[in-house]
């Protein structure tokens, strides 16, 4: 076998050989190619190792066969050679010995041994070649690993740092290499042990060869002695010579195959024998040489094994190195292990349940053993009773013979006959009890099988859940990576904007200084004007005084007229203050300017300390706090003391994904709002710097207003979210003073007017989206909807009226996260990578901004933004899901146009699907069109629903929703209002005859007729298992119905196979009982409230037996005087629908189920009389004229259930267009039904002969 050398792996590209630094993606691709090559090489090595092991096992088997043949030949040789020698000596001396052996046969056997030895040598050489090949492969693999050790270690660390969610393929490769080396080490030890055994056998063979050589030497000596005797016996008698000749002739006849023996020459025979002995000696010597060669080769094999062991030691050293790397990688694997531990804890809990089930099984087996012993005792008693019966019969025959003469014996015989009848009754009771015990035994066995099936299903669900969790985690990791890149890009852009805003601020400060100097010049000019007016005459004095009053008034109202009017800032009046001098105005200007400088310095500190120039720092801090709470809450959910069910885990994963999506959406919106804010700042700076100077030259009072406006702009423009003003009494007036007289460009004013109109809109469900997509609504930006008026009184009024807008528009300054704070308590996600990245910076910023955080906390309290508890969070999620369904109802969307969250809410709220199915649908189904297009096999493959009844449930629900939400549904299948959803008012119209029709619009999720159980889950699988089945007297099937999620919609679609296989309803009577229960629901149009109302009405009266439950039937049996037999129909399937609708179910069937003995005629007569009375008073069944014992159904039953409904499809007008083939619906038609109650008749009158499709969920 040739030694195949593995091809080398191209580890480095030409770029890397030249030493150039390649990009991260190229190195990753090369490394992945390298790992793929190593994995392929590992597979090849495993294949060669497997083949080598097989060949080694074959060689060992062959070696054992050769050893066995050699031992047998050796024994034959040892046993044959002495006899041959003795026979030869006897023949030569003329004695009457045995015939000489067949040396030709020995030579043939010797040749066969030689050929077998050659074959074994070839096999040994092949094994050596294979072992050499394996050693070369291992050396090649070791070279590869040592060559790429550094790159492997770096990439393992890099991969683990990037994706902490799972274990990389490199770790798996290292583990595989370690297992391969350990396997080769164990194999080498096995080979060494076998070599030691073979060497021991070779030494034993050498000893045997030495003994054989000694025997050959002794034979030679005997031959020499025989030759001497032959020389001395030449003068023997002729008769002895003739006998020798005959012996020689015999030898010649036997050795004729050699062709070298002369029958007349004894010496030639001896020579021949000597030659044969020499040949055999030569062959034995060759055998010995070959054995020595074999021993030398075995030594070589041992040396090779030693080298292989050294190689294995080297590989073990490499493995230790890799194990160190693996330990480093295992530190990153702890997160996954924690989640695995939670799953393991759940598995342990399931295992504990299985152990408890096993214990219960053992108890049941012990009880069964006891019952079997009781049964044996009862059988023995039965035999004794039978023997006594036979003896009694014999005695009866004897007494019958004596009956004519002994009349007294007849009385005694009658007594004995009565005793025998009693014994027979007891025997019948015992047989019935035995049958009952056998039935219980079968039920226990079935329960055991069901428990095992449930355990298997739990394992499958756990596996699916772990797969879904892994897939969701990988997807969230990818989204977080993209999120991080986009956030970093936004950071760079915002840093550029901050620098530009710094430049704008410097320009503003310069313009402010210029305006101060201009104000000083204006005051000088005014003082000169005053002097000139004093010098002028008395004729011009009134006009000048008026102008002075006007200018001073303008000056007052432009700067500080509203600063101290905090008490009446909510009114539309402007209260004038006493006049102040020019020094008062100058005192106010530094205040405003210092306020702007203070704000700007604080903003600089925030930007430098945080290096995180977001506009929504408060949002990030709030999200950080919320995320911190959510992390601990999610860890509580994962802990064993918290909620460990699958639904909570799926809900938590969905919250994490929603939080990630929300953060991505917020980043995009912040980017857009940042761009809009930059344009706004540029426009403001340009308008203030250009218009302010012109206004200063023309109107002196207006220049001061412009300065105040610029200072207010400077105080409100920092991008940090912590610049929210404190809610003090002076803040509204000061805010109006700063904001009320500002001029904006015309296009920006129009944009602000649009924002104000949008904010005043009453659609609360879209408010947050509009606020986030539009620029942030600061108080100044929202209120500034007017240009500079001619009268400052009107300006003040407009500012005051604008200040009375809702608090949501006036509480923040430049805080774009104010709207996102509205959404903060709605959904709390996990702490994202952005929160981790900037958490420390925000903490450093919190130390300096504690005062601003207090005001923000006050604003949050005023807006109701407190942290919600766990129950409130669940209620909010539930309300959000109801709102999704309500929105779909309000828009009238077909099912194909529903989005993914609406479909998931529909599955969870209305359908009641398990949490793992909901999680799988959330991951795989993104719209109603995808859900409605899924076939049965796709539902099983994509969503993982393996139970056929679960698939039936989902398929029927999808078909129903598609047909109900279809815009092409005919009017006959709709409600009187023409809407496919029945409103609350229409429901009242259907149930209350005195009420008139109300509005068509209503809440779809509150009270629809056909979907009332859909919205509230009234007739879902919980109701079927917990209430309906016990009311039928079939509570033993509750667990199966609950496992299969059987709801009212599925009842009419269950086949016999489903009942027998999936629901374990093997008893035909129980299936019949279930069928009549379904018929009862059909007659009530699947109306649970009507069913409960009629049951409540017939609780204490013998009427309306159709709706009687099993408990009501038991109470009726107790009331008629059969209390001792009443409990026998528990779990028997006897209920009112069976009595009222099954014409084959008569009093004898009920007596059999009640286990009333046939001898108890009195109880049976009571039952017959009361049963007939029950049928006459509470059902539509009547006694037939021909036979009093048989009953028949009334004509109403035959009309209400036509023959074609027996096959499972009830056709009705208007339903064939919207419903698929085989989809069964019930009809409620005024012409085809006669309802007994007034409510039902009034409902039919208001339906106007239209059909209402009713199904539950």
Swiss-Prot record:
Which Pfam families does the record cross-reference, listed alphabetically? SAM_1, SAM_2
Tell me which InterPro entries the record gives: Liprin (IPR029515), Liprin-alpha_SAM_rpt_1 (IPR037620), Liprin-alpha_SAM_rpt_2 (IPR037621), Liprin-alpha_SAM_rpt_3 (IPR037622), SAM (IPR001660), SAM/pointed_sf (IPR013761)
Does the UniProt entry include the keyword Magnesium? no
Location of Phosphothreonine modifications:
237
Spell out the residue ranges making up region: Disordered: 1-29, 439-463, 709-738, 759-834
A GO-annotated cellular component: cell surface
List GO molecular-function terms, semicolon-separated. Answer: protein-containing complex binding
Phosphoserine modification sites?
Answer: 236, 239, 687, 689, 817, 820
Polar residues bias: where? 787-802
> Which GO annotations describe the biological process of this protein?
dense core granule cytoskeletal transport; regulation of dendritic spine development; regulation of dendritic spine morphogenesis
Q: Where in the numbering of this chain does the SAM domain appear?
A: 898-964, 1020-1084, 1108-1177
This protein's UniProt keywords: Cell projection, Coiled coil, Cytoplasm, Phosphoprotein, Repeat, Synapse
Compartments it resides in: Cytoplasm; Cell surface; Cell projection, Dendritic spine
Looking up SUPFAM superfamilies in the UniProt record yields:
SAM/Pointed domain
| Coiled coil residues, start to end | 29-154, 185-235, 264-541, 643-695, 1081-1107
What is said about its interaction partners and assembly?
A: Forms homodimers and heterodimers with liprins-alpha and liprins-beta. Interacts with the second PTPase domain of PTPRD, PTPRF and PTPRS. Interacts with KIF1A; the interaction decreases in presence of calcium.
Q: Which family does it belong to?
A: Belongs to the liprin family. Liprin-alpha subfamily.
Q: How are the domains described in the entry?
A: The N-terminal coiled coil regions mediate homodimerization preferentially and heterodimerization type alpha/alpha. The C-terminal, non-coiled coil regions mediate heterodimerization type alpha/beta and interaction with PTPRD, PTPRF and PTPRS.
Q: Function of this protein?
A: Alters PTPRF cellular localization and induces PTPRF clustering. May regulate the disassembly of focal adhesions. May localize receptor-like tyrosine phosphatases type 2A at specific sites on the plasma membrane, possibly regulating their interaction with the extracellular environment and their association with substrates. In neuronal cells, is a scaffolding protein in the dendritic spines which acts as immobile postsynaptic post able to recruit KIF1A-driven dense core vesicles to dendritic spines.
Q: What is this protein called?
A: Liprin-alpha-2
What is the source species? Mus musculus (Mouse)
């Amino acid at each position: 076998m040739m030694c195949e050398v593995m091809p080398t792996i191209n580890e480095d590209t030409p770029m890397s050989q030249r030493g150039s630094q390649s990009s991260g993606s190229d190195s990753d691709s090369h490394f992945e190619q390298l790992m793929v090559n190593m994995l392929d090489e590992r597979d090849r090595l495993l294949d060669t190792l497997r083949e080598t092991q097989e060949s080694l096992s074959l060689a060992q088997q062959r070696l054992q066969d050769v050893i066995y043949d050699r031992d047998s030949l050796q024994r034959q040789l040892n046993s044959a050679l002495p006899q041959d020698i003795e026979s030869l000596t006897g023949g030569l001396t003329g004695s009457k010995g045995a015939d000489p052996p067949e040396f030709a046969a020995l030579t043939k056997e010797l040749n066969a041994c030689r050929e077998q030895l050659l074959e074994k040598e070839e096999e040994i050489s092949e094994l050596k070649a294979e072992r050499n090949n394996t050693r070369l492969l291992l050396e090649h693999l070791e070279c590869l690993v040592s060559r790429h050790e550094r790159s492997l270690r770096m990439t393992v660390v890099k991969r683990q740092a990037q994706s902490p969610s799972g274990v990389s393929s490199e770790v798996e490769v290292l583990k595989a290499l370690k297992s391969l080396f350990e396997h080769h080490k164990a194999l080498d030890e096995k080979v060494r042990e076998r070599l030691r055994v073979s060497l021991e056998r070779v030494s034993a063979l050498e000893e045997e060869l030495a003994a054989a050589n000694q025997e050959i030497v002794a034979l030679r000596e005997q031959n020499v002695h025989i030759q001497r005797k032959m020389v001395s016996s030449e003068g023997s008698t002729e008769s002895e010579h003739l006998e020798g000749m005959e012996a020689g002739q015999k030898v010649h006849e036997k050795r004729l195959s050699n062709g070298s023996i002369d029958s007349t020459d004894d010496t030639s025979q001896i020579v021949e024998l000597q030659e044969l002995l020499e040949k055999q000696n030569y062959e034995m010597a060759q055998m010995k040489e070959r054995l020595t060669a074999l021993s030398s080769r075995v030594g070589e094999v041992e040396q090779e094994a030693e080298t292989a062991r050294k190689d294995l030691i080297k590989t073990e050293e490499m493995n230790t190195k890799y194990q160190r790397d693996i330990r480093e990688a295992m530190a990153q694997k702890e997160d996954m292990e924690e989640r695995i531990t939670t799953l393991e804890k759940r598995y342990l809990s399931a295992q504990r349940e299985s152990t408890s089930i096993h214990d219960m099984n053992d108890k049941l087996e012990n009880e069964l053993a006891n019952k079997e012993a009781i049964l044996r005792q009862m059988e023995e008693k039965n035999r004794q009773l039978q023997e006594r019966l036979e003896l009694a019969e014999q005695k009866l025959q004897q007494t019958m013979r004596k009956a004519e003469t002994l009349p007294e014996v007849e009385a005694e015989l009658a007594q004995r006959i009565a005793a025998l009848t009693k014994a027979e009754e007891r025997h019948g009771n015992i047989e019935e009890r035995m049958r009952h015990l056998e039935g219980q035994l079968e039920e226990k066995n079935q329960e055991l099988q069901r428990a095992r099936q449930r355990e298997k299903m739990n394992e499958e669900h756990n596996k699916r859940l772990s797969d879904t969790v892994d897939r969701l985690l990988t997807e969230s990791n990818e989204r977080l990576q993209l999120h991080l890149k986009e956030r970093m890009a936004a950071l760079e852009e915002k840093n550029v904007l901050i620098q530009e805003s710094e430049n704008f601020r410097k320009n503003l400060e310069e313009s402010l200084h210029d305006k101060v100097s201009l104000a000083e010049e204006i005051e000088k000019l005014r003082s000169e004007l005053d002097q000139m007016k004093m010098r002028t005459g008395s004729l011009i004095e009134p006009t000048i005084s008026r102008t002075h009053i006007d200018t001073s008034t303008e000056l007052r109202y432009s700067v500080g007229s509203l600063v101290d009017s905090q008490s009446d800032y909510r009114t539309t009046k402007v209260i004038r203050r006493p006049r102040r001098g020019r020094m008062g105005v100058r005192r106010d200007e530094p205040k405003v300017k210092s306020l702007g400088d203070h704000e700007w310095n604080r903003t600089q500190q925030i930007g430098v300390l945080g290096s995180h120039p977001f506009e929504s720092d408060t949002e990030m801090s709030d999200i950080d706090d919320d995320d911190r709470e959510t992390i601990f809450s999610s860890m509580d959910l994962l802990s064993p003391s918290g909620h460990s069910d699958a639904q909570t885990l799926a809900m938590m994963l969905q919250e994490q994904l929603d939080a990630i999506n929300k953060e991505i959406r917020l980043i995009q919106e912040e980017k857009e709002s940042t761009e809009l804010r930059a344009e706004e700042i540029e426009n403001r700076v340009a308008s203030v710097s250009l218009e302010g100077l012109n206004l200063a030259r023309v109107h002196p009072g207006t220049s001061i207003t412009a300065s105040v406006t610029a200072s207010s702009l400077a105080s409100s423009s920092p991008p940090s979210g912590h610049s929210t003003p404190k809610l003090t009494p002076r803040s509204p007036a000061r805010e109006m003073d700063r904001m009320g007289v500002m001029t904006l460009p015309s296009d920006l004013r129009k944009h602000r007017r649009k924002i104000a109109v949008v904010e005043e809109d009453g659609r609360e469900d879209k408010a947050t989206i509009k606020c986030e997509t539009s620029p942030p609504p600061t108080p100044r930006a929202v209120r500034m909807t007017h240009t500079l008026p001619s009268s400052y009184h009107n300006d003040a009024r407009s500012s005051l009226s604008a200040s009375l807008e809702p608090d949501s528009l006036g509480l923040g300054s430049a805080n774009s996260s104010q709207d996102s704070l509205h959404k903060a308590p709605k959904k709390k996600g996990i702490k994202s990578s952005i929160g981790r990245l900037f958490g420390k910076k925000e903490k450093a910023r919190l130390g300096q901004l504690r005062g601003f955080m207090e005001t923000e906390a006050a604003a949050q309290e005023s807006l109701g933004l407190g942290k919600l508890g766990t129950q409130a969070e669940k209620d909010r999620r539930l309300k959000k899901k109801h709102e999704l369904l309500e929105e779909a109802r309000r828009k009238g969307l077909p099912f194909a146009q529903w989005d993914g969250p609406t479909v998931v809410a529909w599955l969870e709220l209305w359908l009641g699907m398990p949490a793992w199915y909901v999680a799988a649908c959330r991951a795989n189904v993104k719209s109603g069109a995808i859900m409605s297009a899924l076939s049965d096999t796709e539902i099983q493959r994509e969503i993982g629903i393996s139970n056929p009844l679960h698939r039936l449930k989902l398929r029927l629900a999808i078909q129903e929703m598609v047909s109900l939400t279809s815009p092409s549904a005919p009017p006959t299948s709709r409600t009187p209002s023409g809407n496919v959803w029945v409103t609350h008012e229409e429901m009242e119209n259907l149930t209350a005859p005195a009420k008139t029709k109300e509005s068509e619009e209503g809440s779809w999720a509150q009270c629809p007729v056909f979907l009332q159980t859909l919205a509230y889950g009234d007739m879902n699988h919980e109701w079927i298992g917990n209430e309906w089945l016990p009311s039928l007297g079939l509570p033993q099937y509750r667990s199966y119905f609950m496992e299969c999620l059987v709801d009212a919609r599925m009842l009419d679609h269950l086949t016999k196979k489903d009942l027998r296989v999936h629901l374990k309803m093997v008893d035909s009577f129980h299936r019949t009982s279930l069928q009549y229960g379904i018929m009862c629901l059909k007659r009530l149009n699947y109306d649970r409230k009507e069913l409960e109302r009629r049951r409540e009405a017939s609780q204490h009266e013998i009427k309306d037996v159709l709706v009687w439950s099993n408990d009501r039937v038991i109470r009726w049996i107790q009331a008629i005087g059969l209390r001792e037999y009443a409990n026998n129909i528990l779990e028997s399937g006897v209920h009112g629908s069976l009595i009222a609708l099954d014409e084959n179910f008569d009093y004898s069937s009920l007596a059999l189920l009640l286990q009333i003995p046939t001898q108890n005629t009195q109880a049976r007569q009571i039952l017959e009389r009361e049963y007939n009375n029950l049928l006459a008073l509470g059902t539509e069944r009547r006694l037939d004229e021909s036979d009093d014992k048989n009953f028949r159904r009334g004509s109403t039953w035959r009309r209400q259930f036509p023959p074609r409904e027996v096959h499972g499809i009830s056709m009705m007008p208007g339903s064939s267009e919207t419903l698929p083939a085989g989809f069964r619906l019930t009809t409620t038609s005024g012409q085809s039904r006669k309802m007994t109650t007034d409510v039902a008749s009034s409902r039919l009158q208001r339906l106007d002969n239209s059909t209402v499709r009713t199904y539950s969920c």
